[in-house]
């Protein structure tokens, strides 16, 4: 009977049985369940993730004797294993030993939020494990909130959003990689012993060279419409790292979160460090089933107007590149309208005063209309679009500048630059990245968008571009002890602008 129970729950999903004396935390959607085990003053354990459990299933899992893993592994007292969280306390101690101090579930209209609070057994160091279960789309978001009340800063060396054990078998991994003009190439491979790492160090973008999303096919080579699948997508636009450790145990160990490389974070007393959400889904309808769950989740909860059809558009870039002029824009709008299109987007090349934007070497940062190219301005083009029965969109790249620009001449200190080093330049040999960790830069970027939308409220679409990575590690705004915060501060600033 015991072997039959083990087989049953292996088929259902991923699980770790524990003693029935433990208290269970069951987090469910319409068709999936995540099961954890906890006790006051004990360690939080992971039991299961997969197809939705009945009460009888839960009882069978917790009553079956087997090994288990921490739901959020921490470093220091189990050093050979990978960890989700690694810190250095103010006194130099690099160990953690977390115990459960509380569990709270808040029921919302279409999602339930479960927060499990942990505290170190000795230090006033706290972690909240948060799970938001969207009932109607079968997605669970997982993230952490880290804080402390020690007298001095605590160093966060590693700070994953979540950890998920996946039981070994014939497990295959599907992921996406690529390059410019060669994006989203699918690679599928069996998980073998060792460490598989997918990460991004671009600094600005959640790179097209590798994606922060994977799918685990639990029944062998991936199939589109059949087989058990676990999908994971990290909701973060910056540097990320996905790790899959296949060790000598019975499980593949999956960790996902911000890429901690060169990003040690000095956490102040009372400050809360929130990690990005890891979205998890399960389906027994193959890769397509997992994809459909993610699509429903994104359209319903993450995308503006996610339930609306996207407009058919014409973009000016491939047609004229930087050679924008009023007559050309009018002709392109007439052309897309005559073909039944719904939107025209004027791309790069419409701005610049002292330095008109005629090539990629000048003008980024100077977001005023080039009146020589567009005598009637943006407003005149919007009027033409209305007469043609289409909407109007515009291109910007407000987080960037060129060294040949009025903005750079006024604010060279706004640029991400290593002290005592010459600038490493990007596109056109003059492009630089603005330091979005600086509140003044955040205000500038916000105002670029705000002024466009205030002056031209009928703009229907903004193409926000990003054509450069962070090539120089250094911030004029951050203090000398906070230089390792650069990547995190940049994306916090971007998120602040977009709120």
Protein language model regions, located:
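Polysaccharide-binding surfaces and accessory modules of carbohydrate-active proteins
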Residues: 22-35, 42-245, 261
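Bacterial Sec-dependent N-terminal signal peptides
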Residues: 1-22
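Conserved, mostly hydrophobic/aromatic
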Residues: 31, 144, 270, 314, ...
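Active-site neighborhood of glycoside hydrolase catalytic domains
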Residues: 370-377, 383-387, 409-499
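Short Pro-Gly-centered flexible turn/kink motifs
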Residues: 31, 87-88, 95-100, 265-284
């Amino acid at each position: 009977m015991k072997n039959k129970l083990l087989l049953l729950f292996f088929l259902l999903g991923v699980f770790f049985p524990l003693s029935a004396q433990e208290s269970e935390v069951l987090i469910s959607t319409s068709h999936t369940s995540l099961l954890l085990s906890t006790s006051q003053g004990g360690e939080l354990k992971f039991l299961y993730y997969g197809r939705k459990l009945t009460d009888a299933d839960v009882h069978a899992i917790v009553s079956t004797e087997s090994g288990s893993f921490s739901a959020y592994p921490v470093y220091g007292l189990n050093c050979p294993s990978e960890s989700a969280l690694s810190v250095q306390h103010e006194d130099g101690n690099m160990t953690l030993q977390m115990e459960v101090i509380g569990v709270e579930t808040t029921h919302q209209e279409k999602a339930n939020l479960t927060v499990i609070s942990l505290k170190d057994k000795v230090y006033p160091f706290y972690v909240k494990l948060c799970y938001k279960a969207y009932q109607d789309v079968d997605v669970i978001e997982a993230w952490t909130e880290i804080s402390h009340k020690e007298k001095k800063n605590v160093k966060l060396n590693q700070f994953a959003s979540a950890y998920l054990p996946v039981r070994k078998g014939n497990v295959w991994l599907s992921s996406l990689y690529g390059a410019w003009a060669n994006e989203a190439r699918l690679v599928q491979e069996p998980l073998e012993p060792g460490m598989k790492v997918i990460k991004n160090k671009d600094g600005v973008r959640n790179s097209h060279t590798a994606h922060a999303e994977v799918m685990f096919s639990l029944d062998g080579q991936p199939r589109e419409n059949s087989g058990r699948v676990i999908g994971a997508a990290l909701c973060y636009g910056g540097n990320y790292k996905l790790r899959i450790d296949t060790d000598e145990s019975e499980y593949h160990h999956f960790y996902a979160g911000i890429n901690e490389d060169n990003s040690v974070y000095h956490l102040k007393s009372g400050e809360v460090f929130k990690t990005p959400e890891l979205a998890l889904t399960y389906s027994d309808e193959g890769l397509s089933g997992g994809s459909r769950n993610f699509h429903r989740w994104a359209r319903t909860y993450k995308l503006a107007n996610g339930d609306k059809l996207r407009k058919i558009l014409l973009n000016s870039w491939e047609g004229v590149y930087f050679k924008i002029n009023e007559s050309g824009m009018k002709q392109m709008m007439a052309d897309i309208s005559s073909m039944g299109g719904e939107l025209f987007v004027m791309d790069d090349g419409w701005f610049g005063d002292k330095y008109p934007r005629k090539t990629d070497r000048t003008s980024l940062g100077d977001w005023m209309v080039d009146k020589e190219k567009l005598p009637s301005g943006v407003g005149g083009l919007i009027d033409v679009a209305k007469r043609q029965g289409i909407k109007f969109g515009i291109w910007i790249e407000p987080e960037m500048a060129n060294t040949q620009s009025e903005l750079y001449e006024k604010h060279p200190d706004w640029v991400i630059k290593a002290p005592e080093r010459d600038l490493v330049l990007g596109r056109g040999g003059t492009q630089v990245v603005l330091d979005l960790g600086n509140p003044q830069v955040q205000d500038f970027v916000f105002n670029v968008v705000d002024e466009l939308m205030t002056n031209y409220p009928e703009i229907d679409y903004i193409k926000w571009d990003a054509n450069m990575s962070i090539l120089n590690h250094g911030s004029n705004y951050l203090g000398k002890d906070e230089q390792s915060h650069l990547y995190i501060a940049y994306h916090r600033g971007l998120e602040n602008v977009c709120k």
